[in-house]
């Protein structure tokens, strides 16, 4: 026979701390019983009996706040664009970011493509693309043309240096009739030009050298074999 005293029952594990079940009534709920929200928990009331369970976990309130924040982030929609602008959503089909959606904005007059709302707003305010961002593209060609292709290779053409300017003091119409060349002394250049018995000055010789380089760079065929 148990030694426990009548009325001394262990706590019900289904009831939260501080909850109770009223002993009034016949222990059943009639058809008029209904649920009603009470502060800090959920209440069930009926004729002759009431049950109150404390469940102040705030789950519904957190879900409502999360939904409100997501709606704020989604607003405003594309109605902020001026009339005529076109919006295109493109889904990535390959790579680590497959499935992601990219949104592009197209300017109606020039067909320029912008990749973000920030770039569009900057363009509308200043009339030019934002510095430090990728230059807006002209999209009159097919935007899908380069999809699936490898990295574009840029062909660079070697820059040809411009020919030297013609000498200022050389008379192309009246060149010397006859020039003789003699070996230079030690410490001088290899050949020294002479007109008759007169040595050509160094400044004139440099003009001749510049004129020769100018002519041969423009007409290589005129160089005698």
Curated annotation (Swiss-Prot):
GO molecular function, one term: enzyme binding
Subcellular localization(s) per the UniProt record: Nucleus; Chromosome; Nucleus, Nucleolus
Disruption phenotype: Impaired nucleolar dominance. Reduced DNA methylation in some of the targets of RNA-directed DNA methylation (RdDM) and loss of DNA methylation in 180 bp centromeric repeats.
Keyword presence, Zinc: no
Keywords per UniProt: Chromosome, DNA-binding, Nucleus, RNA-mediated gene silencing, Transcription, Transcription regulation
Gene designation: MBD6
Record note on domains: The methyl-CpG-binding domain (MBD) functions both in binding to methylated DNA and in protein interactions.
Region (Disordered): 25-92
Main localisation: nucleus
Domain of life: Eukaryota
Signal peptide (residue range): none
Protein name per the record: Methyl-CpG-binding domain-containing protein 6
Tagged with keyword Nucleotidyltransferase: no
Tissues in which the protein is found: Expressed in rosette leaves, buds, flowers, stems, mature seeds and roots.
One Gene Ontology CC term in the entry: perinucleolar chromocenter
Domain MBD: 71-146
Gene Ontology biological process terms, A to Z: regulatory ncRNA-mediated gene silencing
Record Gene3D superfamilies: Methyl-cpg-binding Protein 2, Chain A (3.30.890.10)
